[in-house]
């Protein structure tokens, strides 16, 4: 028999009143006796504190505080301690006779909250002789000691050999070890279990019926429904496993997706930035080198530009000076041209005016003659008109006079008188005194002849006068011509001057004829002179460019030299062009090769990465495609072997699962048909009756019953007889045993127990010898033990299966990876390294570029030399034809000479042009200049005299004519003849008057016409004279202007002036063009120099900046590389294929990954902060830190239970495999969902029956309990009506509610809750979830109602309530219930602890004085029968004859309080004489 563990002693150190006090505890009852405040409750509080050191539960109050909601602020513990370190320990001897000291170190915490610090500890292996007080204190004098702190206690125990000290940070661990060592009856897994235990201790401490316990008797007394729970687990195991698997799949998928997403995006984010910085660093280096080269080249270019600027400035200065001269010359030429053009226009005007004057002079002479003739005609017409007028007047007067004559005589007398008067007038005029009418006619002829003669003489004189007038006009004209040509000259010198002019005229004509040849000659010489000057200018420029002076005679030799040099340079330039083309073609070919290799490099790098990953994952070195194919064959072979092994393990696992399923059947029935048969026969399976046997008894009973252990116990076999014949589905052997299932025992067999076997005597002639089975399966404990072993074996096989599945998946994925590698990368994976080739080609490219640069510089120099030579040769080609000009030194003299001759010729031509016509006019009339016609006045006088004589002759002739005409009048001497004469005279007079009037009219008309014509001729003459004078004045002015102009206007002067101006204009334009070109070139050069200087400054700034960037980038890069290498992520980040991407593409890639990462890490504060910090572009190392943080985070997230790697990238691979395995397990477990609601109902019903039986057995132990009027205590167990209805429906009417249990959306628990609600609609479910309600319905304890009843006096059995019982009766009844609970806990926990451990039993009772002596005796009897220890407290000694009694007296000595303790062994025990155990405690 296993001996029960006992509490040996209780030790208090530094408690209020107890410095170091050990209470030895009695094996049954320990009584603490003493007055109020003696320390009884403090002692019990120390025991409870050591037993349950949970400050959330401890609350020590007085009995008067029972039921109070609040006590002292410190819950009664702080005030029971003294300052400093305090201890409360329990010394225990367990069933294994091991000494265990458990306890707590307590210490007050300063502060107004009055807190207490508790540290539980345990000591094992302590020698029996050593007392706890010796261990916890240290003597510092004869009568003084100090309390050891916990660390010193630990050091002291460490020095003891074989002693183990353990300090606990968790109350759960403390209680777990106490349970394993048998100190406490129940495993306290949680705070709820601790609370139950504390409530039990508290209820026993304060006594009475605890409402906290009675309300929760089901939780205290009824164990968890392991049978129903197991059945439910069988039913929902697959569901739960499926859910777990689904959750695992979901978590794994989430982890995989998270891993893959984070790894992918973080790798893209960081590696893109990493490679971008690597590329930028390389770019910075290249840029720095390029900038340095460009800086040096710019310095050289600036020096060249400065030299060019100086040369062009010098040339510009020269050209500017020449430009001023050319501008002056051009302006002078333009002015000269303008003057020549003005002179030409003036000369044209002069010529025109001279022509006009000559024409006017001719017209004037003609008009003068016309006017003179018209004057003479007018005078004649005037005389005629006057004579006609006189004749008319005379005739009119005669007619008038004739009218006055009244008679003929008178008229005749008048006529006669008139005739006489006419005769007298004729005589007077003719000076003929002897003139008579008779001889008048003779004298008329004489005088008419005389008149004729006078007229002829007048005409002669008139002709002479006309000739004289003409001679005078010619002289004047000749004289005027000479004056016009020579100027003012005397009339006497005119002849000599005219002769000289005419003498010089031929020579001047000869000179004038030479003007054009001279002008052409001069133009030719001037052109030659200009060409000579240009040639000299070219020669000077050529010498300046050559930097050496050359003479004209040296140019031909220099030309041949330059031609040879040009030919050599031309060949060199052509060869350099071909060489440069070849080099460029080579560069282009290299560039194309680099481009092709660059395009192939990422593919090759990706193939190499894949190949290296395959090599790392498989641990194989693959050097060729043959190695790859051979290894793929090996993978196929390994896959086949692993698949075969996996299938074998799967078969073993299925076999084990069948065994587990068979052993997991309810009531221990291996055949499910037995349960149905037991229900049909109204019996109970034998295995169900013996379901609670211990594992130690299982072999015996298994051998005892043999094959009948699977039989059915029925109340009456005769009632079963009728059912046997109708059985259709039953096992081959069916054992039926008659007996009462409620009180069945093994008395049905006559058996003898032997060593590891049982001999069963069925009859005298039939024995059965059954050995103990090696693996007993009879009884729940044995089955559970076997199930545990099978589960372990199944777990081992499952793990092996998972490993093999993992290996198969891994091999398959490896083969798939190899297949993908073969399909994608095998063609390029084993090619030569393109990057090495790229490096070699780039090096060659750089060398070629350098060579090409040097060659181009040489070529540029040669080209410049060739261009200079070509320009020099061009200049020489222009100079060579003009060498003779350059050597002609007399050209200027000849030009001056010809220019002088031309001036003379032009002067002669100009003189002839001006006076040629005058000379031509002068030549025929030069002779008139010899004599001056001074007799012109005398001749004019003779003419006037002759004119008067002719007029007189006319008058005389007219007078004679009149006399002749009046000759008849001389006959009117008689009066007889006067009338007839008057009539004839009248007629004649009238006729004559008419003729005279007509003559007068005609004469007037002629005179008027002549006057008009004369006036017109005079006007024409006047206008001609005016025009002549005006033109003559204008001609004088023009001559004056020509003199003022001072330019000879010949025919070619304008052409020469224009050619000269045009030449100078061209020269000036060329000069200006050159100046503009030079200015532009200088401006461009200055701009180029400025830009070069700016470029130099910028290049220097950029170079220093890029150099600083290179230096800082190098420092940062070193830090980054150090961080990368230290954390081993270089392989992940240094993705060489990214080196071939542009910076923009890498930045875009990093930005896209950044956006995805922001979403991915939004729920992770650490990664979110790291990502936010990593966004700083100036701190690239933070991106590495972020990547490391991601790796660390993912390493922490790796589920080590399913993934066997620390690398997140490898974890992704394993996750893929694990997903496939978990999915396969899910499919397999779904097939296990095969239990009905009827089975669950049967399990719950059987469990309820079993627990009812157990309660009945507990009731049997309490039936003899007696307290006061109470004669017994029992527990009533009833099934709730609503729950019983649920069981009936589950058993018999489950088909009606399959809609709930077959629903894919509802779990079995939820279906149970829905069914319960459907059956009991009146029950209010509140806010609880169907899952929670269903889980409660699967717990059999919720189907039962427990009530405590007492048998009290005449009332019989009634419900135990404090109000219906006395205090003592209530305390006793409550104690009985607590004992029942403790027993129930021990039975429930029997399978959980060691089989050689029987736990301690101890309860408390404060204020036990409320019980009478008989009740106390009952308690003592109960403790003895149940092997239970009891600590009671009372003011006075209770039953001192039994147990151990301590008398406590609290004393105060010198302000020092202590408790005086006296211990007394009970004298009624089988021990020596009463023993005094007294010890004064300081």
UniProtKB/Swiss-Prot annotation:
Protein family per UniProt: Belongs to the SMC family. MukB subfamily.
GO BP terms, alphabetized: cell division; chromosome condensation; chromosome segregation; DNA replication
Function: Plays a central role in chromosome condensation, segregation and cell cycle progression. Functions as a homodimer, which is essential for chromosome partition. Involved in negative DNA supercoiling in vivo, and by this means organize and compact chromosomes. May achieve or facilitate chromosome segregation by condensation DNA from both sides of a centrally located replisome during cell division.
Protein known as: Chromosome partition protein MukB
Domain remarks: The hinge domain, which separates the large intramolecular coiled coil regions, allows the homodimerization, forming a V-shaped homodimer.
Superkingdom of the source species: Bacteria
Region annotation Flexible hinge: where it falls in the sequence: 666-783
UniProt source species: Photorhabdus laumondii subsp. laumondii (strain DSM 15139 / CIP 105565 / TT01)
Gene Ontology CC terms, in alphabetical order: cytoplasm; nucleoid
Database matches in Gene3D superfamilies: 1.10.287.1490, 1.20.58.850, 3.40.1140.10, Immunoglobulin FC, subunit C, MukB, hinge domain
One Pfam family per UniProt: MukB_hinge
Keyword Chloroplast: no
